[in-house]
Amino acid sequence: MSSFLDLLLVLPAMLIAITVHEFSHGMVADALGDPTPRQSGRLSLNPLVHLDLLGSLMIIIAHFGWAKPVPVNARYFKDPKRDMLLVGVAGPVANFVTAFVFALVLRLGLLSSIGIISGIFLYVVMINVALAIFNLIPIPPLDGSHILKAFLPASAQPAVRWLEQYGFLILFLILIAFRGVFSIVLAPILNLIMNLLLPGSQWM
């Protein structure tokens, strides 16, 4: 963060992005017949139940990160492969929709071009885009792994289960060792989407 003011703007934006993301996972899982998110208290718009300390710090420090995954039990689904795909997609889609809505408010000039509220709205757009893109990376526990899993053959499932056991550690080590590479790869994608939503804007 370049200043304390930036941090004040990022925090509410981060809470909005994380809450929308995880609530959407839980809502879709619940709609498909899995009571686990509701039973675990995750079918909630309270951001505190969705926060992951390390993931939240990564959003503040590195501008991408994650929330506490919503527990889902695929045994409740009629079509586990399809329904896990839908649950996995729900979070990033919700983030993109949220980014679009907040960007639309800014583009329509409904807020002053300067000020705390417009600053928060801009960060809501940026963080929602970043959270959506980052979570599409196919490494557990990120959503991209659930999406990829739906398209893999049965023969690949043992490797997937192994990766699910150690995915978080692998992801963390990659983030630490290759943070610069992540930025180089992800920044052009993020800037492209930001420019589509808010022409002339740049990612953080």
What are these regions (language model features)?
Residues M1-M204:
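Hydrophobic transmembrane alpha-helices and their immediate loop junctions
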